[in-house]
From Swiss-Prot:
GO cellular component: extracellular region
Compartments reported by the entry: Secreted
Organism classification: Eukaryota, Metazoa, Ecdysozoa, Arthropoda, Hexapoda
One GO biological process term: neuropeptide signaling pathway
Main location: secreted
Entry GO MF terms: hormone activity
Protein name: Pigment-dispersing hormone peptides
Keyword Signal: yes
Function text: Neuropeptide PDF is the main transmitter regulating circadian locomotor rhythms.
InterPro entries membership: Pigment_DH
Organism in which the protein naturally occurs: Camponotus floridanus
Protein family per UniProt: Belongs to the arthropod PDH family.
Tissue: Expressed in the brain (at protein level).
Coiled-coil portions: none
Pro-piece positions: 21-58
């Protein structure tokens, strides 16, 4: 029984740390500020560039359409 309690405590600590990492990213990007506010300064741009790369991988519209339709890139280029 003591082992189950120890495992539950360890899992709780690990989950708590994972959630705090997301909060750090959110505070780093200042995403909790009101909408409509752009990158007003170089400091905000630097914070955006230092953030985790998962926020910085935009896809073009053609890449999104091809991924949804399952078309290979060569087939899309041949149609141009």
């Amino acid at each position: 029984m003591a082992n189950y309690i120890t495992i539950a405590i360890i899992v709780g600590i690990v989950c708590g740390q994972a959630l705090s990492v997301e909060d750090v990213d959110r505070n780093l990007l200042e995403l909790n500020l009101p909408y409509g506010r752009g990158l007003d300064s170089e400091l905000q741009l630097a914070r955006l560039m230092l953030a985790a790369p998962r926020f910085c991988h935009p896809k073009r519209n053609s890449e999104l359409i091809n991924s949804l339709l399952g078309l290979p890139k060569n087939m899309h280029n041949a149609g141009k």
